[in-house]
């Protein structure tokens, strides 16, 4: 898409659905051409934006869609629990591949690059910055640093058992604090996604329920088995 202003990108995704096209790692659908096809199908279905993991996947998708793309890189590091876009080089590569928004881990956990440097680099590359946070304190800190979007992405994923329900309270609190809020994390039905907007989210990201076929099939298979 042509380079839009920050406000134009936010306007395009506001009150809309973001499709996170991230297949199961090393699964049969974990191929750039398939990710691109999923992204194009998502746009045809009415998505306002996309979340794409990996530079190769982003490069394969960008020429075929006109909606804003949130780009991330996931890494498993030996010395940090932070996985989402941990390095400045990741930010540069995503921007050069065509991301409009770049998301990074916004938690307070130990990280290889300080978050202040990350948001600065994202803006230097001409992209909007999104922080994937786990609680209100992190979200407020990231907002103060200049992040354009604050997501509830990491709520429930920084230790302990993962809750079944989305973190509605975090979405409400972030919105009350004046953040542009991305509801993300366990919004796996149309009804839950609708609630996210109703309680104040500016937009909502859905992933597994849309693009991870292995997960979707397992939900149905397990439900059928439980009937016997």
Curated annotation (Swiss-Prot):
The keyword Isomerase applies. Gene3D superfamilies: Aldolase class I. GO terms for molecular function: N-acylglucosamine-6-phosphate 2-epimerase activity. Keywords: Carbohydrate metabolism, Isomerase. InterPro entries: Aldolase_TIM, NanE, RibuloseP-bd_barrel. GO terms for cellular component: cytosol. It holds the Pfam family NanE. It comes from the Bacteria. Pathway: Amino-sugar metabolism; N-acetylneuraminate degradation; D-fructose 6-phosphate from N-acetylneuraminate: step 3/5. It catalyses: an N-acyl-D-glucosamine 6-phosphate = an N-acyl-D-mannosamine 6-phosphate. Transmembrane segments: none annotated. It is an enzyme of class 5 (isomerase). Its EC number is 5.1.3.9. GO terms for biological process: carbohydrate metabolic process; N-acetylmannosamine catabolic process; N-acetylneuraminate catabolic process. Converts N-acetylmannosamine-6-phosphate (ManNAc-6-P) to N-acetylglucosamine-6-phosphate (GlcNAc-6-P). Belongs to the NanE family. NCBIfam families: PRK01130.1. This is Putative N-acetylmannosamine-6-phosphate 2-epimerase. It comes from Haemophilus influenzae (strain ATCC 51907 / DSM 11121 / KW20 / Rd). The lineage of its organism: Bacteria, Pseudomonadati, Pseudomonadota, Gammaproteobacteria, Pasteurellales.
């Amino acid at each position: 898409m042509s380079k839009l202003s920050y406000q134009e990108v936010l306007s395009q995704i506001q009150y809309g659905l973001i499709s996170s096209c991230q297949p199961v790692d090393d699964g049969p659908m974990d191929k750039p051409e398939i990710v691109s096809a999923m992204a194009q199908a998502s746009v045809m279905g009415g998505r306002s934006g996309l979340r794409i993991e990996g530079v190769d996947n982003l490069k394969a998708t960008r020429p075929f869609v006109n909606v804003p793309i949130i780009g991330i890189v996931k890494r498993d590091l030996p010395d940090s629990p932070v996985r989402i876009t941990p390095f400045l080089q990741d930010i540069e590569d995503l921007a050069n591949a065509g991301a409009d928004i770049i998301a990074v881990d916004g938690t307070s956990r130990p990280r290889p690059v300080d978050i202040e440097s990350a948001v600065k680099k994202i803006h230097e590359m001409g992209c909007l910055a999104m922080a994937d946070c786990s609680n209100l304190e992190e979200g407020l800190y990231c907002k103060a640093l200049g992040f354009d979007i604050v997501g509830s992405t990491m709520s429930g994923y920084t230790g302990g058992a993962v809750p079944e329900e989305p973190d509605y309270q975090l979405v409400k609190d972030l919105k009350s604090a004046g953040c542009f809020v991305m509801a993300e994390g366990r919004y796996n039905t149309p009804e839950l996604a609708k609630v996210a907007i109703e309680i104040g989210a500016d937009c909502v990201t859905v992933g597994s329920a849309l693009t991870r076929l292995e997960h979707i099939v397992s939900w149905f298979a397990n439900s059928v088995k439980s009937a016997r």
